[in-house]
Structure formats: C-alpha cells, structure tokens
Amino acid sequence: DAARRDFRLNALYADGEGRVFDPTGEGVADAAAGRIVFVGDPETRIREDYLRILRFFRFYAWYGRGDPDAAGLAACGALAEGMTRLSAERVSKELMTLLAAPDPRVAMAAMAGAGVLAQILPEAATGPLFEAAVGLSADPVVRLMTLFPIDERLVRDASTRLRLPNSTRDRLAAAARAAPAVGLTMSDADVRAAVYRHETRAVADALHRRWADRPAEADGARRLLALAEGWKRPPMPVGGRELARLGVEPGPETGRLLKAFEDGWIADDFPTDGHAERLAALVSPPRG
C-alpha cells in the first residue's frame, strides 16, 4: 500500500497505541521538514493518477517549506498534458483548495513555471496583482479573480470549462462586470452608485482587485470597502403605479420614464424626497 501512495508523508501509518510506521523511511522526516516528495519514481506515481500533479502543488502550498522537490516538479511539468484526462470537477476542487492555503504564491509560481497552470487555466497569469491579492484577502475566489484579466466573457468561459460552482462563476463574472465602474479614487456617491447597479459583493471584489493593483493606497481602499459593505441598497422609490396616476399608459414609455427617473435619482445620490415632482417633470417636461 505504501509503495502506491502519492507522497512519502502520506505513506505513514499508526496502530491503535499510537505507534507510527514509516515504510519509506522518509515520511516522518519529510513531514517535519515540509518536503513534498513522491513515493518512488515521480512519473510512475503521476501516471497512476494525473491529479497527483495538482496534489503536489496543493500539498506544497499548505505544508511545504523551502524549494519544491526538483524531481517532482520536473515530472509534473513533463506530464502536465495528462491532466486533460481529468474531470473538470476534480481539477477545480484541487485548484480552489490550493488557493485557500495561507500563502499559495510560491506554489502558484512553480505551477506556472512548470507549465501546469497553462494546462488547466491558460487564461491565468500569476504576477504582482495575484501576489498582492494573497496578502490582502484569504478568500480563494478573490485570489482566483486576480489571475484573470478584466473580461466578463473570458471569465465566464473559463469558469464554465472548470465547472466551478454556479455561485463562484457568477461572482467572478459580476466582479469583472463591475470593475470598470470601480476605482480607488471614487467619491462616496460613486461607491453608492456602483453598489446600487452592481450589488455589494461585486463592488467589494472589484475594490479588492484595485487595491491589489495599488497596495500602497491601503487606507483609502479600506475606507471604500467599509462604505460599500455597510451601505444598504435602497429600493426604487417609484414605479408604474405612480406613472399611471400621471396618465401614462402601461407600455414602453413607462419603462423609458422609469429608467430616466432612476438614472437621475442615482446621479443625485439617492435623495429621499421630491420623487413626485421629479417624475412629473419627466412626464411633462417644462417648455421654453
């Protein structure tokens, strides 16, 4: 059994009295030193299950110290194309668990350098944005977001290919959609407008991305995040009923007028009164 395990530190056994057995003779030492080393020949172990490539990097992200094992890293790179045989669900589960590690930066850089990341996520790129995001958020979805460019369709396509949960796919797409409206120089009114149009989570995720791009602006980013997460999105204060009272028949004109009202209401930072007058002015604009 030990000879077919993936890593030497996974080939440890204990009896009912707590005595540890280490058939490879290296498992205990590996665990103590943070070494992730395949049992026997790395390529043989990988060919038994190509998911072991991702497990190598996932275990390293969580438990590894020092440089990744050179032989294991080389074998992962050499056999990376074999991961195309894996189900998307198995791949995405390993990737998200890796990204949830306290500090996955070295593991992700090693994956990219070995050509493994490109096999599972060719759209992704590690670099300063991802590295900064790891220090700002422990959320694996925020970290994954910073591997992608700001492109909603690309993000959706990649998420669908990986068969990420619908909630994760939709969250990534919403953040990409909100990103053009979000920046660290936003006014408070701009933040409220963005939250109203894009929802709190999407704006907060986009702000994390902007913060990772400009980590020196931490104080401003924190303030904007607190505002976005603390502001309660108000309901639209008027609807078709109010327009009907002004003589507007249901139909396309109703939608146009409500959209015009909403745009003005947002631009004025969500005033709480004067709605009837504003709506009446849209229905019967002043002449002159």
Predicted regions and their residues:
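A residue-level signal for conserved active-site and pocket-lining positions in enzyme catalytic cores
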Residues: 2, 49, 56, 107, ...
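Conserved, hydrophobic alpha-helical core segments of structured domains
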Residues: 81-219
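Acidic, glycine- and histidine-enriched catalytic cores of nucleic acid- and nucleotide-handling enzymes
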Residues: 1-71
